[in-house]
Amino acid sequence: MNIRPLHDRVIVKRLEVESTSAGGIVLTGSAAEKSTRGEVLAVGNGRILENGTVRPLDVKVGDVVIFNEGYGVKKEKIDGQEVLILSEADLMAIVG
């Protein structure tokens, strides 16, 4: 995948979650709840502060993160793969 996010943006691939109903039926597609966990595929150089310095991001490529899929999240298809482009502020935690 040849993409480089700018500034404090992060490219995340959503991790698939297998959802099971109360009766034990495996739900897929639109019936399944979308995961808010993903793997970081690429990161920008960092946030530019008011004094002009760049603050590096806390996440790195390969981290599994929990994210908030809010207003600023952009869905894109790159090399046939759906990815999310979001700001570091939309990341809530690093798993593991």
Curated annotation (Swiss-Prot):
Molecular functions per Gene Ontology: ATP binding; metal ion binding; protein folding chaperone; protein-folding chaperone binding; unfolded protein binding
Localization, UniProt: Cytoplasm
PROSITE patterns reported for this sequence: CHAPERONINS_CPN10
Predominant localisation class: cytoplasm
Keyword field contains Thylakoid: no
Coiled-coil positions: none
TM annotation in the entry: none
Keywords, sorted A to Z: Chaperone, Cytoplasm
Any one GO cellular component localisation term in the record: cytoplasm
Short name of any one Pfam family annotated for the protein: Cpn10
GO biological process, one term: chaperone cofactor-dependent protein refolding
Matching InterPro entries: Chaperonin_GroES, Chaperonin_GroES_sf, Chaprnonin_Cpn10_CS, GroES-like_sf
Oligomeric and partner information: Heptamer of 7 subunits arranged in a ring. Interacts with the chaperonin GroEL.
Functional note: Together with the chaperonin GroEL, plays an essential role in assisting protein folding. The GroEL-GroES system forms a nano-cage that allows encapsulation of the non-native substrate proteins and provides a physical environment optimized to promote and accelerate protein folding. GroES binds to the apical surface of the GroEL ring, thereby capping the opening of the GroEL channel.
Family (UniProt): Belongs to the GroES chaperonin family.
Protein name: Co-chaperonin GroES
Gene source species: Shewanella oneidensis (strain ATCC 700550 / JCM 31522 / CIP 106686 / LMG 19005 / NCIMB 14063 / MR-1)
Lineage, broadest ranks: Bacteria, Pseudomonadati, Pseudomonadota, Gammaproteobacteria, Alteromonadales
